[in-house]
Every structure is written in C-alpha cells, then in structure tokens.
Swiss-Prot record:
GO terms of molecular function: transmembrane transporter activity
BP GO terms, sorted: amino acid transport
Classification via Pfam families: AA_permease_2, AA_permease_C
Compartments, record wording: Vacuole membrane
Membrane topology, Vacuolar segments: 54-60, 116-152, 206-220, 286-308, 382, 484-492, 550
GO cellular component, one term: plant-type vacuole membrane
Name of the protein in its database record: Cationic amino acid transporter 4, vacuolar
Chain ranges passing through the membrane: 33-53, 61-81, 93-115, 153-173, 185-205, 221-241, 265-285, 309-329, 361-381, 383-403, 463-483, 493-513, 529-549, 551-571
Tissue expression pattern: Expressed in roots, stems, flowers, and leaves.
tRNA processing among keywords: no
Length: 600
C-alpha cells in the first residue's frame, strides 16, 4: 500500500540538466499556447450542439448556458493555471497528482487521460471523413483509397481516411514542437474565421428579419432555470481541451507567465465565440425550428444562403483537425512523463536529439490511434473521453487544496532517483541529507518552543488533511444523492443532508485554519495563484463530480474495465519499476538547500 501513496519531488524534472539535445526544446510562447488551447477546445461539436441544446433545454437563452458552463470551466482552469506555473511538466494532471496525491492516483489519472487523447483522437478522425465527403457529394463518391469499406463476414467498417489523417498528423508532430504549433495556429485561425463569419453574416441576416427567434410567446426562458442548468451541463464538454496546454509546459519559454496566460486567454476566446454564436443562431430562427443535426447550415439555408454550407463544412473540418492535432500532441508527452518515473517502459521517454520531441512515443501513440480509427467504430467509446478529462479536472482541484494546506514535507532520495546520479559522491550526499535532517530536528538550540511549534503545525496538517478527505466524501455523497432520481425521497434527502453537513463543516474548517507555510517552498515562485481557496477548488470538485456521476451506466462499465486494465499494468510493471522504490524521504527544506548546493 505504501507504493500507492508515495509522492515524488516537485522539481524532479527540473533537477535534470535541461540544456542538452535530449531534452524538450523550449520554443513556445503565449501566442502558441493560445492557438493550441483554442484549437483543441473548439471542436466540430459546437456546429451541432447549439441546435440540440436550444431545442431540448434552453430555447433562446442558450448563451446563458454557455456562460454558466464557461464559468464552471474557468474554475478548473484556475486550478490548472496555479499548478502548471508552479510545477511545469509535460505530465500535466498526472504530474500534479503524483507530487500531491501519490503514485496510485497519479497512475489512474494518467491512464484515464489516454481515454481523452488517444481514443478521443480516433473518434475525431472518424468524424472528419463524412465532413470531407461532403465536398465529393457524399461518402459513396470518395476516392476508393479513402472510402469506408465493410469487411465481408465480420461486418467491420474500416475507415482508411481517418487512419491516414492520423498518420499525417503524427508525422507532422515528429518534425518539432514549433512546426506543430505553427500548423495548429493556421488551422485554428481558419476555424475561428469561420465562426466569425457565422456570427457577422448571421447577425446581419437576423437584423434584416428582426431577430424573430427572440420574439416568441414562450419568452426568453421557455424551459426555466432547470433547463438552463441542464443545458450548461451539456455544453460544459465543449470547453474541454484547454488542459492540453499544460502538457507542453516543458516546451514553454516562460512557463510561470505564459502557461496561465495561454489557459486563460484560450478559455476566454472560446467562451466569447460560443456565446456570440448562440445569440445569432437562436435569433436567426425560432429555437424549435432548428435542425438538430445541422442547425447552422439549416438556419443559413432557410435564409437563402445555401452556398454558406461549404464554408461551414470547411470550418468543421479545420475544427476537427485542430482537435486531432491537440490530442496527439498531448498524449506522447504524458506517456513520456510516466516513463521517466519508471511507471512505463523507458522507450516512451526517449527524445530525439534532432527534433527534441518524443518521436518514439509520438509514433507509438499515432499507430495505436490510427488502428483504432481504422478498425473500430469509436462512437460507442466517445462518451468515455469525457470521464478521463473530468477525473483529471477533479484531481487537479484536490491537488490545489493539498498544495495549500498539506504540501509534501518530505523529498524522496535514492540511488535510482532522477535527482542524483548513482555515484559514491551521490550516496555520500544522501547520507549527509539524512544526518542534517536528524540534526536539524534534535538540535538543543531549537528548544522547547520549536518542539511546540512542530506539534502545532503537525496537528494543523492532520486537521487539514482530514478536512480535505471529508470534503471529497461530502461532495461524492451529495452529488450521488442529488443524481439518484429513482431513490425514494426519504433516504435520498437524508443522504443529501448528511453529505451537505459534512461538506460544509469541512469547508468551514479549511476556511478557518491557516494555509501551510511550506506552500511557499513548493515548486517555482512568481506564477499564478488560484483565488478564493478553498472555496473555488471545492466548487470545482463538486461540479466535476456531479458531471461524472451523471454519465451513463454503460459508459461507466467500460471506464471501469479500462481502469482495471490500467491497474493490472501498474501492479505487474509500474509498481516494481517505479523510481521511488526504496526511496528515503528527508525534510523538504534540507533537501532544497543541499540540492541547490549540489547543482551549483
């Protein structure tokens, strides 16, 4: 069990000499990060989502749902921004969980992100084929080498176009991060220009017709507050993608400044575009007249602009290509981070000295994603994508609480660790670390006052740790009971009440006690700080947990099977190959001082 809770050093990545050709190249600026964030977030789903949500949940108030969902996504973005600037690593949420929550949860988070990036990338590639076919007059008119074919006898529909697109993107990613980000910026610009075209031209047409979509007897809120909130839960998933930015952290020139900027600006741009698009589309035609499959194309067609369908299709294709590029960009870097920690084979951690990207990992992920897109109809697996991302969002919010109230107070040192090489000198310094740690705690010069302070801080850390654990328990109980509509009223409201008391009591406790002073020594300084702690992270945990619980039972069964497979890999490989095996933990301040001297 100790292996599940062992935590690695926050700066283990940065203590490696990072100026050689075998490290990731620092070439990205804030502008590059914004392009990656916007491109990965704005998928083609928004071209369909507006019609479905407006018809079934919100009516003309669709923009309000997008705003609420944007605020909810911003909560997670704030948590990501703090951790990304404090401990920039290609591992993203996996890395944050490893240094705050332990190896076991970190592995599950990293394994769950495979759902988001690899399976999600395959689903995206499959979605490009029908959009591309519209330029050829339909799927049946595609060239033979691109057309979908059914394998006789087994009924499997293969999609060579999707597989080919994935391999093209994989080759592009192998050329280097700057080349990939440049292409991402170009493709994203085309997509954004398409959305601006829809907003401007659609707004002009709506002005000519008098914004008929808002002049309805049912008013602006035909489905009431419940409809607005239900719509927000659906459109929240259109904001997923900004977290891809954090997987490029080791390739950013100034991560403390640019990572928070990239995350925040990307999310703001997406929110503004979504809201303006919603205002125009539901104003152009009555919400009940929107085509649920092609709402924007149909709205323009009803206004006599059938030719606009080609522009919209171009936008959908570029949106999918940008999302695909972002997915295949992030996954190899997360696997690279896991391999550097010993949890995956070292093959995934190798970096090309010429292009300074994890070429082998990128090719492996590309081949896997291409095979999935070629052979499998991943539509049934697409819902699993959201689970992986929401699990990461939740873990990151918990990490912020841990960082502020119970940051790691020990640093792992061993002959196999990443921080020191296996030499006689290194072993001698490790012994000195232990001696210094013991002497610093037993020195008579510290006196009884220091002992009392240590006792107080130790008690405060225990209270904070239990409060964070009870917050998670309260959130889980409250979200579960609130979602259990088939549960009888009495037990349902009882569980809600008890869970709410646990949640509020723990939250009040966290708000009352002081944050740990060691948080100032955690990671890099001068970056973004998440505001309104502990309230903002707890609200983030509550929202994400509610969304996770409300995902269908069939999807959850598939997710649990996937996590079980990952657990087996960890038990039989990762646990025994972890670099933290037989690690010795010493006080953070002692190690920080000695490590600094060693590096100097």
């Amino acid at each position: 069990m100790n292996s599940l809770v062992r935590r690695k050093q926050v700066d283990s990545v940065h203590l490696i000499k990072n100026d050689g050709p075998h490290q990731l190249a620092k070439k990205l600026s804030a502008v590059d990060l914004v392009a990656i964030g916007v491109g990965t977030t704005i998928g083609a789903g928004v071209y369909i989502l507006v019609g479905t949500v407006a018809r079934e949940h919100t009516g003309p108030a669709l923009a309000v749902s997008f705003f609420i969902a944007g605020v909810a996504a911003a909560l997670s973005a704030c948590c990501y921004a703090e951790l990304a600037s404090r401990c920039p690593s290609a591992g993203s949420a996996y890395h944050y969980a490893y240094i705050c929550l332990g190896e076991g949860i970190a592995w599950l988070v990293g394994w769950a992100l495979v759902l988001d990036y690899t399976i999600g990338g395959s689903a995206i590639a499959r979605g490009i084929t029908p959009n591309l076919a519209s330029f050829f007059g339909g799927l049946d008119n595609l060239p033979v080498f691109l057309a979908r074919q059914t394998i006789p006898g087994v009924g499997i529909v293969v999609d060579p176009c999707a597989a080919l697109l994935i391999m093209i993107v994989t080759i592009l990613l192998c050329f280097g991060i700057k080349e990939s980000s440049t292409v991402q910026a170009i493709v994203t610009s085309v997509n954004v220009c398409t959305l601006v075209f829809i907003i401007v031209v659609g707004g002009y047409l709506a002005c000519k017709t008098g914004w008929v979509g808002y002049d309805l007897p049912s008013g602006y809120f035909p489905f009431g507050l419940n409809g607005i909130l239900a719509g927000s839960a659906v459109v929240f998933f259109s904001y997923i993608g900004f977290d891809t930015v954090t997987s490029t952290a080791e390739e950013v020139k100034n991560p403390q400044r640019d990572l928070p900027l990239g995350i925040g600006i990307a999310l703001l741009i997406c929110c503004i575009l979504y809201m303006l698009l919603s205002v125009v589309i539901v104003g152009l035609v009555p919400y009940y007249s929107l085509n649920p499959d092609t709402p924007i194309s149909s709205a323009f067609g009803d206004s006599g602009m059938q030719w606009a369908a080609y522009i919209l299709t171009t936008g959908a294709i570029t949106a999918l290509c940008a999302s695909l590029l972002g997915s295949l960009l992030a996954q190899p870097r997360i696997f690279m981070a896991m391999a550097r920690d010993g949890l995956l084979p070292a093959f995934f951690s190798e970096i090309s000295p010429r292009t300074q990207v994890p070429v082998k990992s990128t090719i492996a992920i590309g081949v896997l994603a291409a095979a999935l897109a070629f052979f499998m109809d991943v539509a049934q697996l697409s819902e699993m994508v959201s689970v992986g991302t929401l699990m990461a969002f939740t873990a990151v919010a918990v990490c912020v609480l841990v960082l502020r109230y119970v940051p790691p107070d020990g640093v792992p040192l061993s002959s196999s660790s990443q921080t020191l090489s296996d030499t006689d000198e290194s072993r001698a310094e490790t012994e000195n670390f232990l001696v210094d740690a013991i002497e610093s705690s037993d020195s008579p010069l510290l006196g009884n006052e220091t002992a009392r302070d240590e006792k107080y801080f130790g008690k405060r850390r225990k209270i904070a740790a239990w409060s964070i654990a009870l917050v998670c328990i309260g959130v889980l109980g409250l979200a579960s009971a609130a979602s259990a509509e088939r549960l009888p009223s009495f037990p349902r409201f009882t569980i809600c009440g008890v869970s709410a008391v646990i949640l509020l009591g723990s939250l009040i406790t966290l708000g009352y006690i002081d944050e740990d002073e060691e948080r100032h020594n955690f990671g890099h300084k001068g970056g973004f700080l998440c505001p309104f702690v502990p309230y903002l992270p707890v609200l983030c945990i509550l929202i994400n947990t509610y969304l996770i619980i409300n995902i269908g039972a069939g999807t959850w069964i598939r997710v649990l099977i996937w996590l079980l497979i990952g657990s087996m890999i960890y038990i039989f490989y990762g646990r025994s190959h972890s670099l933290l095996n037989n690690a010795v933990y010493v006080p953070t301040m002692t190690c920080t001082r000695k490590t600094t001297d060693h590096l100097a």
